[in-house]
Amino acid sequence: LLVRRLHRTERVVGIDRRRFPDKPKDVIHYQVDVRRKKTRDVFRTERVAAVVHLGVLHDPRVGERERHNWNIVAFQKLLDYIVEYEVKKLVVLSSAAVYGPHADNPQFLAEDAPLLGAQGFGAIRDLIELDMLAQSFFWRHPDTETVILRPCHILGGVHNAASNYLRLERPVTVMGFDPMMQAIHELDVVRAIEHALRPGAKGIFNLRGPGEMPLSKIFRKLGTSPIPIPGALATTVLDRAFRYHLSSFPAPELDHLRYVCMVDGTRAREVLGFTPAYDLEQTIEAVVSPRA
């Protein structure tokens, strides 16, 4: 989605070990692992002006060692190339999940809130480590304008935990809990990245989305019928369903169905000039009818 917008006005070069068969004709795609030496050749020959890092591996089915190597080791190599070839802009797509859902969270979390989302979930531990590496890079290399974006739940055609969960016909909920949820349309995230690429933009920004809604109301909007289950049983049910490939929603995500993890988007609005274009109903509907 980002490439299809940027290539209209910019020269776009992609690096990914996966194929990109339907890329726009004017987009250059290098099918290489960022950790390989060939990546240095790309930076040397392409005169890179900005790097947008989207390559976080979230798949909880991937082994911890492989996931860590891809998420952390690859990102460290990327930072080395940015320094070596004096790239002037770095945009990192993190997540509001780094804050973690907790019973004592304030209603809205600011960018300086502690990153407490790693409890019992290796994929989030990696994301927090990556976020902190980007923060360290921001301070150590002021010549590169570094932007870290922390969006709330991204909804659309994307295959992430939130969208996968809301696409379930009979999603499990935790009995007695109905947390308020924030969501942002995947195309609004693309727009936020475009804002972050503007000269002068730097720092950490929460991406709040168009508003909040109780989880139960989201289900009503989608016409789905959740199955309320006691907390301890819900963990067991989801763990087994995930293990036997009956569900793509991992049990450690259950805390998002109990507690709030909502962010304050004031800084993105006032500094980046970003406001969502899609309202909350459009954002929720994008789970089943994503926009091109």
Q: Which role fits each region the language model picked out?
A:
Residues K77-A123:
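Conserved Rossmann-fold NAD(P)-dependent oxidoreductase catalytic core, especially the SDR/UDP-sugar
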Residues V190-A251, G265, E281, E285:
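Mid/C-terminal beta-alpha module of Rossmann-like enzyme folds, strongest
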Residues V32-V73, Y81-E84, P101:
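NAD(P)H-binding glycine-rich loop region in Rossmannoid oxidoreductase-like domains
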Residues L1-A50:
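N-terminal Rossmann/SDR dinucleotide-binding element
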Residues D104-I148, H153, T173-M175:
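Catalytic helix-loop patch of NAD(P)-dependent Rossmann-fold dehydrogenases
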Residues D126-E129, N160-S163, V174-L197, G203:
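Substrate-positioning beta->alpha
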